[in-house]
Amino acid sequence: SFMNNKIMKKRVVVSLGHQALGYTTLEQRDAVQITARALADLVEAGYQLTITHSNGPQVSMIHKAMTELRRVYIDYTPAPMCVCSAMSQGYVGYDIQNSLRAELLSRGISRTVSTVLTQVTVDPYDEAFYEPTKIIGRYMSRDDAETEIKKGNYVIEEPGKGFRRVVAAPKPIDIVEIEAIRLLADAGQVVIACGGGGIPVIEQKHALQGASAVIEKDSIAGKLAGDLKADQLIILTSVPCVYKNFGSDRQEELRSLTVSEAMAYREERQFGEGNMLPKIDAAIAYLNVCPQGSVLITS
């Protein structure tokens, strides 16, 4: 019967957005406890769970702390973006796995929850590297911005607020640790992987070189769900469902969509570039690999 149970279990990939994690260390601890209850409900209902998460506020906080450290200690080398990303995976993963483990134990479920530090390969010639768009870190003065530009980094000005660093958001190619993630998932474990989109790396012979970039967390959630042949991808966000004419007086709920309908609305530019569009693209990419699957985009 054990094998039957294993086959019966529906595999779900859940992607957690900022609102599921909070913006500061204390906010995160509280937010994660609420999120853990929802995740535990899925485990209790018999789903095999793989979790991925955003790390926008966390990676910015770490990047800012490392940059400030450099100001105080001149000899200190600032941490590159890929190292900040690795730190955020550990820190967010630690909070999620402990909260979820405790929540499961309180329900009498003994299940290992583990975080897999995940790297994702990207193409060094990805056009995103020539046109960085992802804003990270704190506001800077003009002097600081000029220093960043001299270092070869990209900076944009937000009128009246200051300057901010922007990095590339290349497309994910391969999840390096996918076999480890798959083995844990197949063994019925709860896995946290590809946090913050994964650490972007470029293959150089046998070595993996960290890239100064971040991967869109929604696109990696779609890739992960496809690679694991998940039955469902759940993308948690700040709105209850997908809308057309979002934010206008003609706003309309889209409670269910086929891939072709989603593609048609996409052509009409119905989905916001920075928020809903990457989620729709992730859904389409996953469903192209797993046509029997389904995607839930909700709060």
Feature-to-residue mapping (PLM):
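Glycine-rich beta-alpha junction loops
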Residues: 117-124, 196-199, 239-241
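N-terminal glycine-/serine-/threonine-rich phosphate-binding loop
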Residues: 3-52, 61-71, 183-188
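A glycine- and small-aliphatic-rich helix-loop capping segment at beta-alpha/alpha-beta transitions
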Residues: 28-33, 65-76, 129-138, 205-213, ...
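Acidic, metal-binding active-site segment of PIN/NYN-like and related structure-specific nucleases
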Residues: 230-248
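Short beta-strand segments at enzyme active-site cores
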Residues: 13-15, 48-61, 112-117, 191-194, ...
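Ligand-binding beta-strand-loop-alpha-helix segment within the catalytic cores
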Residues: 69-191
